[in-house]
Amino acid sequence: MAAVTQLGYVGLGVSNVEEWEHFATDILGLESNGVDEDGNLSLRMDEYSHRFIVQPNGKDDVEFVGWQVTDEPALREIVEQLRQAGIEVTDGTEDEIKSRRVEGMIRFDDPEGTRTEIFYGPPISFDRPFNSPRAVGFVTAEQGLGHVVLYVEDLDRTVKFYRDVLGMKISDFIRNLAFFHCNPRHHSLALIEAKSPKKLNHFMLQTQNMNDVGATYDMVLDGAMPLTRGPVSYTHLTLPTKA
């Protein structure tokens, strides 16, 4: 069975791209690639040419989630798994492949209607090292972007999809939450069963050290952004190593 290997990129639909660029660069420490001719902003956090694509459509929600696979055979195997599960799959257009800067991709909606993309040939910029405007570093590599947490109305159905069709493994269950991993990161995806007008609960970026977290927290306390939740310590960010 083919399986996704990491959270590759996230697309966001927003009301104000300029404010998002300020938030992403000045607060989070991501690097901006600027805005393209369609008004889309792309953002970097490592050697990939982008990890976020921000689109000016006013939704203020997740627009799509991109999962990486190892190669084209793995992508084609996942296509068959999706079709056997009754999911309508579409190959990425030339414009979409160019926009994502990947070698190949497919797209479909998950059982909750979240647009999902799977790609191979990651968008790496070998000639341009990541340059954070805040000198922040992020933990990515085989662990991917970080994690994304989505609201769902039918947890059982959606768990079966990500586990049995996309090959993710369950890390934990906590009441109405399910956590999935596809690499050493404890979870790259979490699902919350709850009614919500939005699909996105949050995304997580892991910095390379606690100092970066503290400096960002200080900026927020100084009024850079509204604080919705204070510091919290995760029990573990990666899966326990087997003895």
Positions of predicted regions on the chain:
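Intrinsic, low-complexity N-terminal interaction/targeting segments
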Residues: F52, T114, F126, V136, ...
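Internal, well-ordered alpha/beta segment that forms a basic, Gly-enriched binding/recognition surface
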Residues: R100-P123
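Surface-exposed beta-loop interaction hotspot
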Residues: F126-E153
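Core segments of cupin and vicinal oxygen chelate
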Residues: A2, G8-H50, E96, L150-S188, ...
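Short, structured motif recognition centered on aromatic/hydrophobic residues
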Residues: L7, L30, L43, F52-V54, ...
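Vicinal oxygen chelate
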Residues: Q6-S15, N57-R83, G104-D110, G144-E153, ...
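Conserved small/polar residues in nucleotide/adenosyl-binding loops
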Residues: T235-T241
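Asp-box/WD-like beta-propeller blade repeats and closely related beta-sheet repeat scaffolds
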Residues: G92-S99, S132-A135
